[in-house]
């Protein structure tokens, strides 16, 4: 339920392993040859579907039916059936009467308990009659995950959803599963297609297409001609809008205008944010330029002419500043200089992620400063009026979060910092890339000089990549920055070097490559749960407030000693 991408490991099997339910498995450790080296791998030699008791407890609570006992023959026979057949419970309850009846009879002839099939019978009856809640049941039967179901369970039967114990917030998914979510859960399109027919749901698919185009491609307005293959766009949009529950109409409605279609809420949020920023432009601080000039003369640590020019100009005419720049161009350094200048003023530093917040906290040691993530800043911004607020990582802040923040934020000066080429916000966020085009040009500052490398050819490569120069590959080849992948990557040339991987999973993912590299460590292996640790292994700490500030995100170290006991393990 709480698995981390850092804690997954890859196993191999000659069989197609069921992907929807929890399984029990046995695996053996062995090796394969890759790049003239031995890579440790794990191979599954036996497995069985084993939906956990907590998941059947959730299922029974949703149906308001007696609990299914995982110790019964009925339960174990069903797990055996799911393992051998490879079917899902959704497929089983939607089978013909003859097939379903045969499976039910075979299992019940072996068992005295019938709680499981009583629950499946109720699901089958609701699904076959297409009753309210049937699409939710189809999906739950497919997934049966505690981390999904626990958020859907209401404390009493809901008459709007066939008296199932489900919250009203589940209703949008039941009505339009191809373009709605459950409570705290966004089903994948693959899973939806696996359990619900798309016939007659073209209006949902149209809305989903527009939403994905907006959120993932940052394309607020989609040309109608791009989605005409789905059907009559105007008719589908009207059908979608009429099926929305009333509180979602201002946010999710599809709007057609000038041969374009867009989602009303996304457009409205963008306009709201831009208008709010325009209202904050102001007229600057009286005497700021002279005061900053004096401070710069007395502060020899500011030795960059680019930053001096920006600092002199920043609040001389306006109360708002936007700072754009790639990694390593000195955005944080500029924030540090401003913080020092405003040392006696109240300051709030906000970032979208905890690592970025902690980085600011470590870098900026100035009095009258508070630090927070945007998600946790309400206690700080509600009712408070700061002299200056800094918001870092702006390109990763989605529109909805920024709109809500600006509603509550009271400050004399506002500094927005980010890189439009950085990883985008998870949800739709176009405000930071658009803001510069709607605000006075002389409140927008761009840092262009990278300071993390003085190697001119590396800087040139960086510039080509950022500008999507079509000659980038040619330049990489000329400078010999790329080579054939071979076993030289496993020869350590520096104690602090790393290998970058494209993902966490798979044969060449971070987790598997870590095991590959660990194989070179000749220290004795210490086994704990499904993991192997060795003295001398390098470690990196992920987000953990348990020992902050002694241990912080991305802190690096090495295992020097391991003490293993019966129920505990200690690392030095």
Feature roles, as predicted:
Residues 1-287:
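N-terminal accessory nucleic-acid engagement/regulatory domains that precede
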Residues 263-267, 304, 350, 506-507, ...:
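Conserved phosphate/pyrophosphate-binding and hydrolysis machinery centered on Walker-type P-loop NTPases
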Residues 286-299:
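Conserved adenine-nucleotide phosphate-binding loops and their immediately adjacent elements
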Residues 299-317:
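Pre-Walker A adenine-sensing motif
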Residues 309-311, 421-552, 556-560:
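Conserved helicase motor core of P-loop NTPases
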Residues 312-316, 321-477:
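ASCE P-loop NTPase helicase motor core
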Residues 400-414, 534-535, 542, 549-550, ...:
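ATPase/helicase motor core of nucleic-acid motors
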């Amino acid at each position: 339920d709480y698995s981390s991408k850092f804690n997954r490991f890859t196993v191999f099997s000659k069989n197609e392993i069921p992907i929807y339910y929890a399984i029990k498995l046995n695996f053996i450790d062995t090796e394969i040859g890759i790049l003239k080296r031995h890579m440790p791998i794990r191979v599954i030699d036996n497995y069985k579907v084993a939906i956990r008791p907590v998941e059947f407890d959730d299922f029974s609570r949703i149906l308001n039916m007696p609990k299914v006992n995982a110790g019964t023959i009925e339960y174990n026979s069903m797990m055996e059936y799911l393992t051998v057949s490879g079917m899902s419970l959704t497929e089983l309850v939607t089978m013909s009467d003859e097939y379903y009846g045969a499976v039910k009879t075979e299992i019940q002839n072996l068992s005295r308990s019938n709680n499981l099939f009583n629950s499946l019978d109720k699901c089958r009856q609701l699904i076959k009659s297409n009753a309210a809640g049937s699409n939710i049941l189809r999906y739950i039967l497919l997934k049966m995950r505690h981390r999904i179901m626990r958020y859907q369970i209401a404390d009493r039967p809901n008459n709007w959803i066939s008296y199932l114990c489900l919250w009203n917030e589940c209703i949008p998914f039941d009505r339009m599963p191809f373009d709605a979510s459950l409570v705290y859960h966004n089903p994948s399109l693959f899973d939806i297609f696996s359990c619900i027919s798309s016939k007659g749901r073209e209006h949902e698919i149209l809305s989903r297409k527009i939403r994905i185009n907006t959120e993932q491609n940052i394309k607020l307005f989609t040309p109608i001609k791009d989605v005409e293959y789905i059907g009559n766009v105007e008719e589908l949009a009207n059908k979608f809008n009429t099926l929305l529950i009333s509180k979602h109409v201002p946010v999710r409605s599809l709007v057609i205008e000038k041969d374009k279609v867009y989602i009303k809420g996304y457009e409205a949020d963008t306009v709201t944010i831009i208008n709010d920023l325009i209202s904050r432009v102001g007229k600057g601080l009286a005497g700021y330029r002279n005061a900053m000039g004096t401070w710069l003369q007395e502060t020899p640590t500011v030795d960059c002419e680019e930053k001096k020019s920006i600092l002199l100009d920043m609040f001389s005419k306006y109360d708002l500043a936007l700072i754009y720049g790639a990694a390593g161009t000195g955005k944080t350094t500029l924030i540090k200089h401003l913080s020092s200048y405003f040392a006696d003023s109240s300051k709030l530093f906000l970032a979208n992620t905890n690592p970025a917040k902690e980085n600011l906290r470590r870098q900026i040691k100035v009095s009258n400063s508070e630090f927070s993530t945007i998600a946790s800043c309400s206690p700080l911004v509600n009712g408070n009026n700061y002299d200056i607020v800094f918001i870092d990582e702006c390109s990763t802040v989605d529109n909805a979060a920024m709109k809500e923040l600006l509603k509550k934020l009271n400050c004399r000066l506002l500094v927005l910092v980010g890189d439009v080429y950085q990883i985008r916000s998870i949800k739709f966020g176009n405000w930071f890339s658009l803001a510069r085009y709607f605000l006075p040009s002389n409140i927008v500052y761009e840092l262009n000089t990278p300071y993390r490398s003085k190697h001119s050819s590396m800087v040139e490569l960086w510039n080509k990549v950022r500008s999507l120069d079509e000659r980038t590959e040619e330049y990489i080849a000329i400078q010999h920055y790329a080579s054939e992948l071979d076993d030289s990557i496993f020869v350590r040339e520096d104690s602090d070097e790393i290998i970058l991987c494209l993902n966490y999973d798979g044969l060449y993912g971070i987790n598997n490559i870590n095991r590959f590299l660990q194989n070179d460590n000749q220290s004795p292996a210490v086994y704990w749960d499904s993991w192997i640790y060795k003295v001398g292994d390098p470690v990196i700490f992920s987000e953990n407030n348990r020992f902050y500030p002694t241990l912080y995100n991305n802190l690096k170290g090495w295992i020097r000693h391991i003490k293993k006991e019966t129920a505990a393990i200690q690392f030095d």
